[in-house]
Amino acid sequence: MKTNAGDIAARLGGTLHGDPATPIHGVGTLQDGQAGEIGFLADAHYRQYLPVSRLAAILVSAACPEAPMVQIIVTDVKRAWRLLADDFTPPFPPPAISPQAHIDPSATLGPGVSIGAGAVIGAGANIGDGCRIAPLAYIADGVTIGRDSHIGSGVRILEKTTIGVRANILANAVIGERGFGNNFEDGRWLPVAQLGGVRIGDDVEIGACTTIDRGAVRDTVIGNGVKLDNHIQIGHNVVIGDHTVIAGSAVIAGSVTFGKYCVVGGACVFTGHITICDGAQFTGHSSISKSIHQPGAYSSGIPAMPALQWKKFFAKLKLLAKEK
């Protein structure tokens, strides 16, 4: 894509400081950007790189006198960058169905569907208009996927799964595998059949290698607008409310219910059968073992500190425990 600073400012509704004819052909960072590229400044930490940056233009929320490049001043830098990044994203290739894909004759494919080599579409599956199924994806019998969804390479979507429109499911995610249900009988663990499914709303993103178990009886539910990072484990019967975001490596045990607009930091762990209210936020590595009824920020665990300081802290903690 080739454009100029003036056109970008007009597109974003920004105020231009500099030559509107400045050519822009790509994007870059303050540290590593090159001539002809545009970047953004949304964190004061990176302002130190402005005077020496080679970028041709920068998105900022206020004028920076030390910046040698063209500046485009916008109200919301992150929103402006999202719009600009979309403009620079290469278009998808024309829709095509690979002859190496295996598609059951009873499956339904909407107009404009693309299916890559080695992908499998099971009996009775329903793939909505404009969906893109990457190579080696597996869509089981009876699965429904809403229009304009992207299913990444190696994704496994198993029986009794329904997915809304505009889903983005990244490589090697697994949706609808059996939940971790076992019963201890006569000195051994015996598996309990998992009879539910998975229901996923509209505009959901599911990261690479994330797993979502099907329900034991009722469905596991992922609400509209939910964003899940990579390597997340979601147990059976979990309900995640609309527009909740969960960062990588979080572990959510079975039957946890989240409200809407929750924010979960990386590597958080949730005990099963608890309820999280709307608007709760958890910092990374928090361990949540009880229901949360009030919105706000919650933390647990100890942040990193110098090793010697940690040893002294832990020694004092042991002494405190002995005193009690």
Describe the role of every protein-language-model region.
Residues M1-Q100, G112, T161, R166, ...:
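Terminal amphipathic alpha-helical/low-complexity segments used for targeting or macromolecular assembly
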Residues F40, A96-P306:
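Structural signal for interior beta-strand "rungs" in well-ordered beta-sheet cores
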